[in-house]
Amino acid sequence: GSWLVMRLMEPGYMVRATVRDPENLKKVSPLLELPGAKSKLSIWKADLGEEGSFDEAIKGCTGVFHVATPMDFESKDPENEMIKPTIKGVLDIMKACLKAKTVRRLIYTSSAGTLNVTEDQKPLWDESCWSDVEFCRRVKMTGWMYFVSKTLAEQEAWKFAKEHKMDVITIIPPLVVGPFLIPTMPPSLITALSPITGNEAHYSIIKQGQYVHLDDL
């Protein structure tokens, strides 16, 4: 997200970044210190778990990027802490786009985990492929709740977009790696470094997929 903010400001776009706590300077300061932030960036409070909280931030915008998602592989209640909030979050943002009446396009960051997690692997994947949600729930491989949440959320997003004739694009990246601007390490890099740190749970994720550098995304 922080890289997206920087990349959007570079050609001159006015950017509204949403965070759960604008008063948390440890997390917000790196954004405010980016080149051009004083004139091109504003920080808005919004939370995927609070219905309608994105309405004001999106009002007046012409483009919206949805890049965040609840992620906790050690959740004791993944259904209510990850899966349902992910679905509700994307739909709430799409509703806010409709209310704004100014948004021309929504770009939604989905995941390669929405199409290639199946019992029978295929030699080729395309836009007609979906991960097998029931297979994920049954096997419960590392990160299964993430695969389920992103798959169901994207399916609901496409239904909503078709019903309301919204211009939506989904991006399907695998594990995203690269330098980071925030003071805490992103979850994707914790996974990427697992061969060094010895984190077996995260290492099992590496064996399931591929990488993409953020500059290529």
From Swiss-Prot:
Top EC group: oxidoreductase
SUPFAM superfamilies named among the record's database cross-references: NAD(P)-binding Rossmann-fold domains
UniProt keyword NADP present: yes
Signal peptide start-end: none
Key words of the record: Flavonoid biosynthesis, NADP, Oxidoreductase
Enzyme Commission (EC) number: 1.1.1.219, 1.1.1.234
Amino acids binding NADP(+): 27, 146
Pathway recorded for this protein: Pigment biosynthesis; anthocyanin biosynthesis
Catalytic activity, reaction form: a (2R,3S,4S)-leucoanthocyanidin + NADP(+) = a (2R,3R)-dihydroflavonol + NADPH + H(+); (2S)-flavan-4-ol + NADP(+) = (2S)-flavanone + NADPH + H(+)
Membership in a protein family: Belongs to the NAD(P)-dependent epimerase/dehydratase family. Dihydroflavonol-4-reductase subfamily.
Function text: Bifunctional enzyme involved in flavonoid metabolism.
Name of the protein in its database record: Dihydroflavonol 4-reductase
